[in-house]
């Protein structure tokens, strides 16, 4: 806020004096907001002047206020439409949304496709048993979700039928098969999802773009596990919601997925540990970074990148410039029939459009039949400084090329050099020179 106000005065006659004055005004305004911010409280009995429901406190709060919630079980669907902080008691604060749409809905939809709410904090709360998402944030900016337990939501899902009850498809355009997963950021930017546990929902964490552009979010240090019908963490470019009046996807991009554990997801529904999807014409999922995660024992591929819109279909698809670096892959499953691999796979990139700018580096693989699968009509995949296992390190299933130089092939002799060495299948894979020892010390794996 302060730099914007200062910059506005640069063209004035005395820029430094006016710029300083503008900053003083901004600081004064900000100080007034802080001084006027209130702290409200909630406890089950309503003692000490507290509310008995979270909703009552949220409705009474003003922008900048904090709502402190005592331990207890609160049976409600909390809707947040302004800048407030919702602080629980280290997960002993439980929102039980049985029979309700969501546990918490951060709702900026009135301004879609722009963000209609910002600066919302939700921390230390258990959210369970919602029909759809446990926590849904739509058309929002600068949201912080920290230290929450999101467990056992998506109750309306009929997995065998691929339907999700009365989910509002006017803005959730592609969630019938998972009810929106446990925690869903839709049209959200510059937000942080930190140190949450997301478990036993249909899917884990979903980042999508139905109601506006979705980007510059950080998803870090979360434990995402046993969400058995879908992926652990998903970045997906979907069709735009009708309420936006748009015809093309807004796009997902420049998100960081770091230092999470994604484990045991998709075991019944062929979900990946991490999914990056730009499935249809005009969809965009670009510039994302998947770094330093533990991705293990998921029902499908460790990281799946998919596009199913073949050129010359217009408008074009952008699934480029994503980076997968420093992760550990172990014991994941094969990719699904739409982008098949022949066995358990660490990373699979499947695209019917050209792929460029995607890099895979400093990853370690074990208990995978295929470490990296690649299928694209053109383009090049860059794969360097990885420690491969003893199976197929690179499976090139398309006409694109793979620069797989400077990797450790599980032996000093390089690909196929002995029975312990990793191998290559397919053509168009460059492997020499290679590393004569592992890139990552075994103690760091």
Predicted features and spans:
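N-terminal secretory signal peptides that target proteins for export/translocation
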Residues: 1-17
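Bacterial N-terminal signal peptides
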Residues: 21-32
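Right-handed parallel beta-helix/beta-solenoid
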Residues: 32-56, 60, 71, 92, ...
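Extracellular beta-strand-rich solenoid/capping regions of secreted or surface-exposed proteins
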Residues: 55, 59-63, 74-87, 94-143, ...
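Parallel beta-helix/beta-solenoid
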Residues: 62, 81-83, 90, 117, ...
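Extracellular beta-strand/beta-solenoid scaffold signature
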Residues: 97-112, 129-137, 159-187, 199-214, ...
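Functionally critical loop-and-helix segments that line ligand-binding/catalytic clefts
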Residues: 337, 342, 385, 395-445
